[in-house]
């Protein structure tokens, strides 16, 4: 714990005091090449830390704004498909990627969707239990 305390109380303040931040804009003209390098290294580190901290929140916003259903029953406020369980037969595959031309049944469109997006979605397969 003493090691961490020394870093926070001694080394970080010493480093921040050594960063060559001029008092005015004209002071930037007086900086040497070594001071510019030190200033760029510090600025780059701060920018990278801010980017790494903010990036996950920006990605979530982009994901939230993307539509899942691009074309199926867009005139409806909610897409609902009812299927009588007695009509299923032995095996049926339902689409979960919303790309099927035979929606709600799967036509294998998820394979192209997965290839294009890197997703791993597949169909919902309902199968009668073998007795």
Curated annotation (Swiss-Prot):
[2Fe-2S] cluster binds at residues 95, 97, 106, 110. It comes from the Eukaryota. It is a single-pass membrane protein. Its main location: endoplasmic reticulum. It is found in: Endoplasmic reticulum membrane. Gene3D superfamilies: CDGSH iron-sulfur domain, mitoNEET-type. Residues 59-131 are cytoplasmic. GO terms for molecular function: 2 iron, 2 sulfur cluster binding; metal ion binding. InterPro entries: CISD1/2, FeS-contain_CDGSH-typ, FeS-contain_mitoNEET_N, MitoNEET_CISD. The keyword Heme does not apply. One of its GO terms (biological process) is regulation of autophagy. Its cofactor is [2Fe-2S] cluster. Keywords: 2Fe-2S, Endoplasmic reticulum, Iron, Iron-sulfur, Membrane, Metal-binding, Transmembrane, Transmembrane helix. Binds 1 [2Fe-2S] cluster. GO terms for cellular component: endoplasmic reticulum membrane; mitochondrial outer membrane. Residues 1-35 are lumenal. The chain crosses the membrane at residues 36-58. Belongs to the CISD protein family. CISD2 subfamily. PANTHER family: CDGSH IRON-SULFUR DOMAIN-CONTAINING PROTEIN 1 (PTHR13680), CDGSH IRON-SULFUR DOMAIN-CONTAINING PROTEIN 2 (PTHR13680:SF33). This is CDGSH iron-sulfur domain-containing protein 2 homolog B. It comes from Branchiostoma floridae (Florida lancelet).
